[in-house]
Amino acid sequence: MADQEYPVYGEITGPIVMIGFGSIGRGTLPLIERHFKFDKSRMVIIDPHPEGDNAKIAEDHGVRFISEAVTKDNYKDLLTPLLTEGEGQGFCVNLSVDTSSLDLMRLCREIDVPYVDTVVEPWLGFYFDTEADNSTRTNYALRETVREEIRKHPGGTTAVSCCGANPGMVSWFVKQALVNLAKDLGMEFEEPAANDREGWAKLMKKAGVKGIHIAERDTQRAKDPKPMETFWNTWSVEGFISEGLQPAELGWGTHETWKPKNAKKHKKGCKSAIYLEQP
């Protein structure tokens, strides 16, 4: 139940199913508790790793914990009864690795359940497929599968994909930065609606913007300082390894007239990115 000391942004009338309970899941749980009205007895967390503090943290929050992996073979049988149990409309929060975002979205659409995730994730094995070429193993290719689904099946129950920090919140920040830039340049303009893609593109062109570079500053600090000449990964271990096996990718604007020697263009989709023949 939401704490009245915090603003409550909405009510979830049905069950809530959170898939994955790593660092992002553990950080998201308190936010759901603070900012949504819901029946905590109808919330469940699914994660294959009960060891450590996972199960205990869920128990301390009064949330049911299921120790099981969501796989290509079991996801429909596992998730459907959990998301449709009882009255109201359920809500699926996918914060896991190795679970196909696209398949989960399709399932949620079938059973009329809103869905949100932080990245377009494939099923286990995608990043280690030695038979796949570099183009099909890119994040661009993964995102295009969702874009194609939208084109084929518009409308339906809301699904919000890639809504983490980056990608996600950075898109909102870029819009505000563009508005600030236009004001600083003394331009006469009307701020486009949030979903007016063409309007934002025209404003970007009018302001003379050709490239957007987003730099992230990691402010995490460990109790024991990192020794010199060492590398510590403060991100997802699974994510770091899997993305390290993918080709390097770059967003590539329509104004670009050249590309690196080892760069390749995509043959399908919006073609807004290129990839390098190297990690």
Identify the function of each model-found stretch:
Residues 12-30:
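Glycine-rich adenosine-cofactor-binding loop
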Residues 70-84:
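Conserved Rossmann-fold cofactor-binding substructure of NAD(P)-dependent oxidoreductases
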Residues 99-114, 118-157:
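Rossmann-fold NAD(P)-binding glycine/threonine-rich loop
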Residues 209-279:
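Glycine-rich, aromatic-lined ligand/substrate-binding cores of catalytic
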